[in-house]
Amino acid sequence: MATATVATTPEGIPVIILKEGSSRTYGKEALRANIAAVKAIEEALKSTYGPRGMDKMLVDSLGDITITNDGATILDKMDLQHPTGKLLVQIAKGQDEETADGTKTAVILAGELAKKAEDLLYKEIHPTIIVSGYKKAEEIALKTIQDIAQPVSINDTDVLRKVALTSLGSKAVAGAREYLADLVVKAVAQVAELRGDKWYVDLDNVQIVKKHGGSINDTQLVYGIVVDKEVVHPGMPKRIENAKIALLDASLEVEKPELDAEIRINDPTQMHKFLEEEENILKEKVDKIAATGANVVICQKGIDEVAQHYLAKKGILAVRRAKKSDLEKLARATGGRVISNIDELTSQDLGYAALVEERKVGEDKMVFVEGAKNPKSVSILIRGGLERVVDETERALRDALGTVADVIRDGRAVAGGGAVEIEIAKRLRKYAPQVGGKEQLAIEAYANAIEGLIMILAENAGLDPIDKLMQLRSLHENETNKWYGLNLFTGNPEDMWKLGVIEPALVKMNAIKAATEAVTLVLRIDDIVAAGKKGGSEPGGKKEKEEKSSED
């Protein structure tokens, strides 16, 4: 590492080209520092990998505790300083946003690839050759997945359920996974849309509402929307069947003028007329709503007490201060339109639901809008005895929803339990001699790194990793055994597809792409220049200001 002086002239005169306080790490030292950062993050995550993985307790600066084994959450909560570590976290977050799962696979594979690259660097193999070999190996790995992946359609409910079960199996909610998997498949199938010849799934249309209390098995799927608000007036009905719903992005209040204005009142009758006029304005708004046939009003803004009174008199159920996102979901669920001007509201703008009802959930009251003809928005109401259980259930459900959506969108699935990884490694070892040279070593190293995932799965299950890896290699020599992986609960190799351990092909492919991209990016860096901290000797810094004041 060098500080301010980083270069010399041919005559040996030092030339300062970086400010004091800056630092530079270059060559092999920079490469090793970056590889060490990748390996350190892998070490932090690998004990959570697989269905027998452990959980992490994360405590933030305020003392708030999070207990989870969700890769994206762990990385998000880790306060990393090293720039390469931050880079890896960004890539992992991209994986989570793209496929909602496979974050740990991407990070752990990146760590294994970094370890193998380090071994090759010690053998004096240039980073460029390693990068080239890794890129060729990545192509073979992706092609292998494409070759062996099984087609899955939205009607293959049994396969989709197994995908959800596999995702939930590695979470803290594994005890309730059978029940939750059914909810996940029904929710995704309900919001899926056929566009052309491809299915599209927008998971924003699956609303997740959390309420502490009850047990995980009290979690329910609502074919509609749950509004976390209560009915605004005690005189209003709490249950409306065959509901015609007005969705308002306008307030049911007397609007104040934009300009500052004063009203001079000389006697009490003028005050009475003023208040009477305000009341008439609100009554007209309520009459306008009632004239459309609406018997439910869900408003994003406020509802005046006078308006509440008139709505209650007409037997209209009303909710105020609903979230904008809830209003948008309600529009999709009920077929209604969100209206910004009450004067423009017509009967064609109303949404329909078989039932709108206020129910008590735990200590709070909520309004359930359900039973629409073909809702394209649904809700999952999560219950749990502890707040942390509810939070972890939400994370588990989001991952499961994402994996099922991935299979529906992509239309392909593969077996888990290391079956895909061992098949990729087998094909890479057959391909490597065709390339020859030093790149062959990089491709073989890639195969070993892929197998490293299986060894970590075995370690976390308390099994002998080398013994199990050898068994799988032997089985995969036979082409008919391509789905053989490791049953981590019995410790024996089994046909993972028949066992029901199924994952989205898209998650596997994206994890391989993300890991390879991360490591090749790291291997190309041979120089790290870090600027000095603010407040040092840079312009405007404290030191410079002190020097200037002393000169004055």
Swiss-Prot record:
One of its GO terms (molecular function) is ATP-dependent protein folding chaperone. It is an enzyme of class 3 (hydrolase). Its EC number is 3.6.4.-. The keyword Glycosyltransferase does not apply. Optimum temperature is 75 degrees Celsius for ATPase activity of the isolated complex. It holds the Pfam family Cpn60_TCP1. GO terms for cellular component: cytoplasm. It is found in: Cytoplasm. It catalyses: ATP + H2O = ADP + phosphate + H(+). Residues 540-552 have a biased composition (Basic and acidic residues). Residues 531-552 are annotated as: Disordered. Keywords: ATP-binding, Chaperone, Cytoplasm, Hydrolase, Nucleotide-binding, Stress response. Induction: Transcription is induced by heat shock (shift from 75 to 86 degrees Celsius). At 80 degrees Celsius and above ThsA and ThsB are the major proteins synthesized (at protein level). Belongs to the TCP-1 chaperonin family. Forms a heterooligomeric complex of two stacked nine-membered rings; one of alpha and the other of beta subunits. Sometimes called a 'rosettasome'. This is Thermosome subunit beta. It comes from Saccharolobus shibatae (strain ATCC 51178 / DSM 5389 / JCM 8931 / NBRC 15437 / B12) (Sulfolobus shibatae). The lineage of its organism: Archaea, Thermoproteota, Thermoprotei, Sulfolobales, Sulfolobaceae.
